[in-house]
Regions:
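Extended alpha-helical targeting/anchoring segments
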Residues: 1-186
Length: 186
């Protein structure tokens, strides 16, 4: 795959969509850029009959609700979306049976920060301020294989319903999620 290409699993349609050669990409690195970027994307998709495939990071949450807090950003954009002509239906390349390299993951937070966050979540639940929190943090690792291979192994191991592979150029996003965050149909 090349920069800008993507695979998206569509559980409802029972297929995978392959997006190739974006006509444009849109990225937002600051919270203040997220909503204008989404508005511009929506306009272009409607006007130019394009498809949009990408991601919005959890850290973009304050763009939608200023009461939300998110940690300071890093070099990963808060939003990255490719604009494409119609995708092709298909399946990602099959994974050959072979052992996977050992990957040593490093959390983006230390143990004390994790313990503090869990204590705060428990306090909020006990106080009745929330009933559920989806707590996440980033993991980083040096891969001993191409990101595409890691993605195929993740899909084979997890059998997710809403997997996605996004080659954003400088970054690759591999997601093996069991649920869809949002979908916009016209």
């Amino acid at each position: 795959m090349t920069a800008g290409d993507a695979w998206m699993q569509d559980q409802a349609a029972g297929c995978w969509w392959r997006f190739r050669a974006p006509v444009d990409t849109v990225a937002a690195s600051r919270v203040s850029e997220v909503i204008p970027a989404l508005q511009a994307l929506e306009t272009r998709v409607a006007r130019e009959h394009l498809w949009a495939a990408g991601y919005i990071a959890y850290e973009a949450g304050p763009a939608f609700d200023p009461a939300l807090r998110a940690r300071a950003g890093d070099e990963l954009p808060l939003l990255w979306v490719g604009l494409y002509p119609a995708p092709e239906a298909g399946e990602p390349p099959a994974l050959a049976a072979e052992s996977a390299p050992v990957v040593h993951w490093t959390p983006g937070i230390d143990r004390a920060a994790y313990d503090d966050a869990i204590a705060e979540i428990r306090r909020l639940i006990a106080a009745g301020d929330t009933y559920q929190v989806n707590y996440t943090f980033r993991l980083q690792a040096a891969l001993g294989e191409a990101p595409e291979r890691l993605f195929r192994r993740m899909v084979a191991a997890n059998r997710p319903g809403c997997a996605a592979y996004l080659d954003c150029g400088r970054h690759v996003v591999c997601s093996a999620s069991p649920e869809l965050f949002f979908r916009l149909d016209r």
